[in-house]
């Protein structure tokens, strides 16, 4: 999603910095790469100097918030996940704590919660489809969304005024995992029998109850099938960049005269 944010902001004529822990090749003349570590705080003061908006797409938050305060309180835009306050999953508790830290920081802020990315669902299905029979958790429902839709929305929020909690951003359709699995198998050309299994526990119960859905906020435009077919037509595995997509880097927009 971070790459989409960068592309959208540069297309809008903004000067963009990309923060990473190591030097990266320059991908465009409009983008400046800076070195810093949001986990330790190293390099953040220099990276944030002169920045008026931060789009934060990774999970460590404490050091970034502290550095942002020292930098003059830029607008902090954070991408989070729909349902983190409804599903008792450890990682979601961490995300919720990050949201609270941002909201209580005194910084101008905007938080956008999005439903699960197509990449993550495709990666999950790839793992499940490796054995000759797919043991598929039954009753789970997702509303997968494309990173392009979310990235473009984040860029628009970054260009606007801070609004606190933005309306949730969901994919175009809420689907069962069984439906998504059959679409995945059809596109990648695999034949696998599906054996439904019911997983116990509050996490899976919450997902079955729709805890990860935002049906009233179906703002995404790219369906899971469109995503899969695009990847297949391009000769790419639909899940290839899934993990990389979930480990993006924070992006910073410098002050510009408008």
Where is each model-derived feature located?
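Short, amphipathic alpha-helical "lid/cap" segments that border enzyme active or binding sites
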Residues: 45, 65, 147-155, 221-228, ...
């Amino acid at each position: 999603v971070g790459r989409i944010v960068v592309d959208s902001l540069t297309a809008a004529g903004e000067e963009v910095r990309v923060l990473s822990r190591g030097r990266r090749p320059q991908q465009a003349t409009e983008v400046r790469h800076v070195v810093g570590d949001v986990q330790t705080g190293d390099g953040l003061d220099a990276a944030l100097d002169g920045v008026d908006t931060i789009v934060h797409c990774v999970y460590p938050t404490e050091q970034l918030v502290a550095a942002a305060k020292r930098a003059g309180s830029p607008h902090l835009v954070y991408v989070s996940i729909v349902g983190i306050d409804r599903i008792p999953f450890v990682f979601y508790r961490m995300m919720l704590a990050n949201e609270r830290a941002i909201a209580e920081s005194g910084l101008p802020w905007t938080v956008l919660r999005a439903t699960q990315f197509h990449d993550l669902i495709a990666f999950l299905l790839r793992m499940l489809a490796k054995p000759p029979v797919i043991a598929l958790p039954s009753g789970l429902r997702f509303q997968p969304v494309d990173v392009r839709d979310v990235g473009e929305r984040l860029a628009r929020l970054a260009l606007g005024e801070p609004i606190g909690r933005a309306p949730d951003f969901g994919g175009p359709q809420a689907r069962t995992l069984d439906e998504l699995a059959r679409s995945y198998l059809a596109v990648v050309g695999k034949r696998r029998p599906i054996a439904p299994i019911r997983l116990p526990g509050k996490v899976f119960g919450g997902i079955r109850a729709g805890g990860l859905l935002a049906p009233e906020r179906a703002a995404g435009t790219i369906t899971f099938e469109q995503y899969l077919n695009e990847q297949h037509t391009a000769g790419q595995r639909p899940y290839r960049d899934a993990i990389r997509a979930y480990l993006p880097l924070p992006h910073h927009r410098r002050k510009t005269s408008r």
